[in-house]
């Protein structure tokens, strides 16, 4: 079973100076996270209901840390055309207008599409955050029920317990690596944080200086 967080992550983050070095360390960590999940699925013969083209989970609130948001921001700036980037920024503005007036609880009881969802697919799949990579289902019908009844927060999750537990521990371990090195450990909502990252270059400098990265984004209280 591969180690997670990868043994190199603390050193990668500690020695990073440029955005590219920070993002490189996180990319390697995300690859290790995927390897960990795939190994568990293979070893335990977990039968996932997830399939290409299904986007029911892309209407859920997505919690992220600032380092994940900055990787996504770098990715869209580098990979999207000017037209695609402008369209994304417009969708992020609409998304923020919907989400910012809501409490996190109000948000999770509504279906609000991720602004990064395009034609039923994730437009930043290669750099999607840990919480999206952790999410999985054993039962499509359970996902459909959650989508159809967003206010029913008592419906049992259709996760594989061992897989979800292990990936949650790994996700928290990665976040703790950044926190121990003095970086912002606030839990943000993805769309509102990405909107600010793209709109406000100083957010990167604040984060790099150990301050709170995003001042307007929706925040999820720590458990």
Predicted features by range, described:
Residues 1-223:
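Short loop/turn segments that flank or connect secondary-structure elements
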